[in-house]
Amino acid sequence: MKKLRKTGAILFSVLLLTACGNLELPQNLGSLENTGDAEYIGSVGNITSAHAETLADVPAYSDEPYAVVNNNEPDFTESDMTTDSYESYSELDSSGRCGIAMANLGKDLMPTEDRESIGQVKPSGWQTVKYDNVDGKYLYNRCHLIGFQLAGENANEKNLITGTRYMNTEGMLPFENMVADYIRETGNHVLYRVTPIFEGGNLVASGVQMEAKSVEDDGNGICFNVYVYNVQPGIEIDYATGESRMQMSYK
């Protein structure tokens, strides 16, 4: 499968110039309202002050896997919108942490073969631990920033972070499925960016920001900007190291 991949750092834009149309979010996922100011959350990669302020408004986790950011409008500019497919991944930082992953997704990037093993990749903060109250037992998954079904990336260490089972399947997957279904049905492109958000020097991301906008129809088909929490109900996580323990109320 031939791919065009851009290299180099990805720069965030300041604000979306054109508002997206209304989009129904994945079923069984309710949006959260901003209930108060959160501490500033830093990220690996280049980020504007305006964008950081937007993320600072994300409320603390409260029983929903994601929160809507910036009124659900992604921070893409008109110059970002293109019908040329590409993928771009940030270099790992000195702590081995992933940065921003961005792509203009099209049918030509989607996989034509089954996924290969990714077990050899150990993302920052990786721990192998099981809990009986976690679906599949394992607390952590190797979470693709840009899902395999969208770009066919296998053991790409620049695209895999330590993420909870809950974030992977309840938070990220419904949005990935929505984008994949749209591309298959229309043949259109979707501009897509996922930013892992690390607090200070933590090795495990507190969450990921997912942004997407369909290109040919200017966001009428796909348009979202959400923050997905890297949490697991019933489990306490030390984001500095990846270590964890069951909450007392679940014992």
Task: Name what the model sees in each region.
Residues 78-251:
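Domain-level detector of nuclease and nuclease-like folds
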Residues 21-24:
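Bacterial signal peptide processing site
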Residues 1-9:
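Bacterial N-terminal signal peptides that target proteins for export
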Residues 30-91:
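N-terminal module-boundary/linker segments of secreted carbohydrate-active enzymes
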Residues 10-14:
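Cross-kingdom leucine-rich repeat
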Residues 16-19:
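C-terminal motif of bacterial Sec signal peptides marking the signal peptidase cleavage site
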